[in-house]
A protein has these predicted regions:
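Short loop-to-helix capping motifs
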Residues: 115-117
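Helix-turn-helix
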Residues: 13, 17-55, 59
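Short alpha-helical scaffolding segments that buttress acidic/His motifs in well-ordered protein cores
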Residues: 92-93, 106-110, 146, 150-153
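Hydrophobic/aromatic-rich alpha-helical bundle segments in the mid-to-C-terminal region
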Residues: 119-120, 124, 128, 137-185
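Hydrophobic alpha-helical connector segments
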Residues: 70-103
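Short, basic, alpha-helical segments at the C-terminal edge of helix-turn-helix-like DNA-binding modules
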Residues: 62-67
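N-terminal intrinsically disordered/low-complexity leader segments
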Residues: 1-9, 181-185
């Protein structure tokens, strides 16, 4: 008996490997040939499902965006649980910074937005989501300043292969959000 075809499963497999390839090796590394190789499908399948390389990239980025949106929801719950305290936020963000693949995925969204302006809304979602969740614990301006700082910390971590010092992170978050730390912090 011939195995049943699963066009949507095949398309999804190609998108999953395309997203991972861009995260691992950059926007430019993605080709129809590379996706076919990684997904173990004929080259013609990639051009059948995706009219152009831009179509493939954009569709794969939507996978990354969906994952980022889910992470934002999880982070929002954790921020709420720590009541937006600088100590809690710093601990939460240090955990976030420990996942290099996640940081690279976020950076991919920024790079995509720089390369193709129509993709900027994908990248802007993280900063907007972070600002919104922090606005419950600080002024809108302080929340935005903190979100922008945290964004810079992500780039620092990627460039230096290590996160910032947690104490320095706590102090910066407290200063930006206009709150104070306990004396021993």
């Amino acid at each position: 008996m011939t195995p049943r075809r699963d066009p949507e499963g095949r398309r999804r497999a190609m998108l999953d490997v395309a997203a991972q390839e861009m995260i691992d090796n950059g926007w430019e590394a993605l080709t129809h040939r590379r996706v076919a190789e990684l997904a173990q499908v004929p080259l013609g399948a990639t051009t059948y499902y995706f009219d152009s390389l831009d179509d493939l990239r954009t569709s794969a980025l939507e996978i990354v965006v969906a994952q980022a949106d889910e992470e934002i929801r999880q982070v929002a719950q954790a921020v709420h649980a720590c009541a937006g305290s600088p100590e809690g936020l710093a601990a939460l963000f240090m955990e976030y910074l420990s996942d290099r693949a996640r940081l690279k995925a976020e950076n991919l969204l920024y790079y995509a937005g720089v390369q193709q302006p129509e993709l900027r809304p994908y990248a802007q979602r993280w900063i907007r989501g972070t600002t919104e969740m922090l606005s419950a614990y600080a002024t809108p301006e302080a929340a935005q300043a903190t979100a922008l700082y945290l964004d810079g910390v992500i780039l620092y971590t990627l460039l230096h292969d290590r996160p910032v010092d947690e104490r320095a992170l706590r102090m910066a978050i407290a200063a930006l959000m206009g709150t104070s730390l306990p004396e021993n912090q």
